[in-house]
Amino acid sequence: SYKVSGGLLRVGVSVVNALSKKLHLTIHRAGQIHEQEYAHGDPQYPLKVVGETDTSGTTVRFWPSEWTFSQTIFSVDILARRLRELSFLNAGVRIVLRDERVNLEHIYDYEVGLSEKSALDIAGLPGKLADCQEKDPALSELYLVEGDSAGGSAKQGRNRKMQAILPLKGKILNVERARFDKMISSQEVGTLITALGCGIGREEYNPDKLRYHKII
């Protein structure tokens, strides 16, 4: 997690603190509970001991500043997407996202897969996919074409019964060299993964769900 974030406690918190009207820290360490609060980046009192503990860990609570942001309502979809990426990068770490506004909870654990489907899970096929009529993957073909214009020509000349057409941008992400979180956040890569239907990742990938046995 430290490698991914670039050092959350050295960079992330200081930036969040500067952009928050209020930030509250609770630190469980060495048998003591420490607490400190900030307002618009300024400490309201020195770090103080407020109790004893037999656990360790840090809780950070913050309220975005209306001085900086015109919109201070959190998007659960954006948070869910980022936490899902982090769950793939940090095997064995259990991440819980709770939206108390609607009493909703998502749990991410890469070693055991997603415990609950999130709002990111795509219910249907990509909108640009011109699917074929054939339902048997062994008889189905998927053609990847460059751009919408080429996709239009390919759709006109295809065999609708067995040939599906998926237009993609001319130059998508080089997944061989990209970080996993960047790869799965790519719209074009996500579209391709969804169209193929077999998932991605050690726990979610299932080749038996591949929708096309011939990809061109």
From Swiss-Prot:
GO molecular function: ATP binding; DNA binding; DNA topoisomerase type II (double strand cut, ATP-hydrolyzing) activity
UniProt keyword annotation of Transmembrane helix present: no
Reaction it catalyzes: ATP-dependent breakage, passage and rejoining of double-stranded DNA
UniProt main location, coarse: cytoplasm
Pfam families: Toprim
Annotated compartments: Cytoplasm
SUPFAM superfamilies: ATPase domain of HSP90 chaperone/DNA topoisomerase II/histidine kinase, Type II DNA topoisomerase
Disulfide bonds: none
Role this protein plays: A type II topoisomerase that negatively supercoils closed circular double-stranded (ds) DNA in an ATP-dependent manner to modulate DNA topology and maintain chromosomes in an underwound state. Negative supercoiling favors strand separation, and DNA replication, transcription, recombination and repair, all of which involve strand separation. Also able to catalyze the interconversion of other topological isomers of dsDNA rings, including catenanes and knotted rings. Type II topoisomerases break and join 2 DNA strands simultaneously in an ATP-dependent manner.
Name of the molecule in the record: DNA gyrase subunit B
Gene: gyrB
